Amino acid sequence: MSFEVTGPPLVSPWMMLSMSEARNDIDETKIVIPGHSVCDAPQQFMRGHGTYVRDGEIVSSLSGVVQQLNRLLMVKTIKQRYAGEVGDVVVARVVEVQAKRWKCDVASRLHANLPLGSVLLPGGDFRRKDVEDEEKMSEFLKNGELICAEVQQVQHDGTLMLHTRNNKYGKLQQGILIKVPPHLIKKSKKHFHTLPYGMAVIIGCNGSVWVTPSLPETTLEEDGSHVHEFQIVPPDVRVTMVRIAACVRLLRDYSISIYLNSLTTCYEMSQPYEIKELAEQDTSSRLAYLIAARLLQELQQQK
């Protein structure tokens, strides 16, 4: 028995089954499983990564999405470790302080490196780092602290080189971190968002979403949530933070792509429910279906 699940990474495959009848072109978003035929005309294509030839046809060896590059067919796995690219915005956790660099966990195969020379020191200094700065590295960033950084370079072994030489990057405090599969993060030109609810969100390309209050005296674009002194967060702001975090988890649990539009749509449609109800299966499944339907409608209108 063979079956085919269609749908872009925008929503979960099981939702797309009931919505794909009106779609005409579904080849580019076809999801395959091991042993499943990749294409209908194998003689016109060459096999690539994640495929093999069986009885004259190209068959998938992985569970993932079919990708085509000219005449080359490949299968890209849906769930995989984060593989960074230059320019990616990531939310990382410092795991070790070494000589002239910090080791950071970015949910990749290897820990990323943050060199001392690639850090903007407190006060906004762009000066040359000296021995005194190296001795104070553990004061700048400690083990377990969260940072927002940008991928500057990808080395030959896959190690990511980070930098925070910009005011919008740096240490993160007073917020909520939600981990999601990296493939659910939709790439965009902007990953720093100030929401109209008095919140700010950093959607990291590595699958880490940071929710923090947008403080009135500063903006996220100006200081990147550099908080050197803890400030009192009002109860209503905390409730909003928890609701946004619950919305991110709902999108994650139902495999809906996470970006600004999907997050704001989920937040607005969740208003009739209490926050604790968003974790209940009946409420969350019904809400996820409505969110997916609206996002699909908006996508079709854009086309």
From Swiss-Prot:
Subcellular location: Nucleus; Nucleus, Nucleolus; Nucleus, Nucleoplasm
Keywords recorded for this protein, A-Z: Exosome, Nucleus, RNA-binding, rRNA processing
BP terms from Gene Ontology: CUT catabolic process; exonucleolytic trimming to generate mature 3'-end of 5.8S rRNA from tricistronic rRNA transcript (SSU-rRNA, 5.8S rRNA, LSU-rRNA); nuclear polyadenylation-dependent rRNA catabolic process; nuclear-transcribed mRNA catabolic process; poly(A)-dependent snoRNA 3'-end processing; TRAMP-dependent tRNA surveillance pathway; U4 snRNA 3'-end processing
Pfam families, A to Z: ECR1_N (PF14382), KH_6 (PF15985), RRP4_S1 (PF21266)
Tissue: Ubiquitously expressed.
Domain of life: Eukaryota
GO cellular component terms listed in the entry, alphabetical order: cytoplasm; cytoplasmic exosome (RNase complex); nuclear exosome (RNase complex); nucleolus; nucleoplasm; nucleus
Chief site of localization: nucleus
GO molecular function: RNA binding
KH domain segment(s): 175-213
Summary of the function given for this chain in its UniProt record: Non-catalytic component of the RNA exosome complex which has 3'->5' exoribonuclease activity and participates in a multitude of cellular RNA processing and degradation events. Involved in regulation of antisense ribosomal siRNA production. Involved in response to cold-warm shock.
UniProt record similarity statement: Belongs to the RRP4 family.
Subunit structure: Component of the RNA exosome complex.
UniProt-recorded name of the protein: Exosome complex component RRP4 homolog
Organism: Caenorhabditis elegans
Gene that specifies this protein: exos-2
